[in-house]
Curated annotation (Swiss-Prot):
Bias type Basic residues, positions: 1-27
Protein name: Small ribosomal subunit protein bS20
PANTHER family from the UniProt entry: 30S RIBOSOMAL PROTEIN S20, SMALL RIBOSOMAL SUBUNIT PROTEIN BS20C
Chain residue ranges for the region called Disordered: 1-28
Short name of one Pfam family: Ribosomal_S20p
Domain of life the protein comes from: Bacteria
Amino acid sequence: MANIKSAKKRAVQSEKRRQHNASRRSMMRTYIKKVYAAVASGDKEAAQKAFNDMQPIVDRQATKGLIHKNKAARHKANLQAQIKAM
């Protein structure tokens, strides 16, 4: 454990940030899973609606630095291709 005051503060801040990021990452993954589930069920309209709900969430997390912008683009491209192929 840290002994210096600033190190203790950084440890507290780091833990808060870790929990916040974990929450956001979990939310984003849930939205992505909803799209995959809709694609698996074969309902194109539900899949497109789920994709439209997921897209701004993923973009926002990429903008804030939670994930890389290329990862966000890859998720969107793969899911959109699956929806289009239905």
